[in-house]
């Protein structure tokens, strides 16, 4: 869940990316805001979104893991330059119980899977976990042509 600690970690990561002029890669998996923290938890949506927006031209890649719900979906994760989902991951603003309570019926299971969300324009790619390292590496290389691949990085990628 996203509370003040997670919000602070995302903000600090974005600030470090800016200082180092390095891409920000986030892999959220969250059921939403930590409601027991009250308004402080909800404030993290604005804080993390503002931090991600300050990245400017620095690449921001988000890999939505299962599940990615609520405040995370509606904040820093949704404004990445490239948004990837893992196959079958549940990605939506409201959880199943909230949807069921609002609609007074059960939401279909296939609604709001990564594939459904991609079809409706919220994701750029759906990539299996075993292919993520190479895919994210290629994306970052494309978005940051000034970063020269080093033999260490190339060797690491070859091992995957």
Predicted feature locations:
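A broad, low-amplitude sensor of folded, mature protein cores
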Residues: 14-17, 26-27, 76, 110-112, ...
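Short amphipathic alpha-helical "recognition" segments used for binding
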Residues: 12, 48, 158-160
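Conserved catalytic cores of soluble enzyme domains
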Residues: 31-148
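Conserved mixed alpha/beta catalytic, RNA-binding, or beta-rich assembly cores of soluble enzyme
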Residues: 3-10, 44-45, 51
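Flexible beta-alpha connector loops of hexameric P-loop NTPases
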Residues: 1-5, 37-40
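A short, charged, Gly/Pro-tolerant segment at domain boundaries
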Residues: 150-160
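A structural preference for short, pocket-lining loop segments at secondary-structure junctions
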Residues: 8-33
């Amino acid at each position: 869940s996203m509370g003040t600690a997670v919000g602070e970690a995302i903000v600090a990561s974005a600030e470090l990316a800016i200082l180092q002029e390095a891409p920000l890669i986030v892999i959220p998996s969250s059921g939403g805001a930590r409601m027991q923290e009250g308004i402080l938890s909800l404030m993290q949506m604005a804080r993390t979104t503002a931090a991600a927006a300050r990245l400017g031209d620095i690449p921001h890649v988000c890999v939505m893991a299962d599940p990615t719900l609520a405040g995370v979906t509606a904040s820093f994760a949704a404004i990445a330059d490239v948004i990837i989902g893992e196959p079958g991951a549940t990605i939506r603003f409201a959880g199943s119980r909230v949807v069921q309570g609002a609609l007074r019926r059960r939401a279909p299971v296939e609604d709001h899977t990564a594939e459904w969300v991609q079809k409706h324009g919220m994701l750029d790619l759906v990539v299996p976990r075993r292919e993520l390292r190479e895919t994210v590496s290629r994306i970052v290389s494309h978005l940051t042509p000034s970063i020269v691949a080093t033999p260490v990085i190339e060797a690491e990628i070859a091992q995957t």
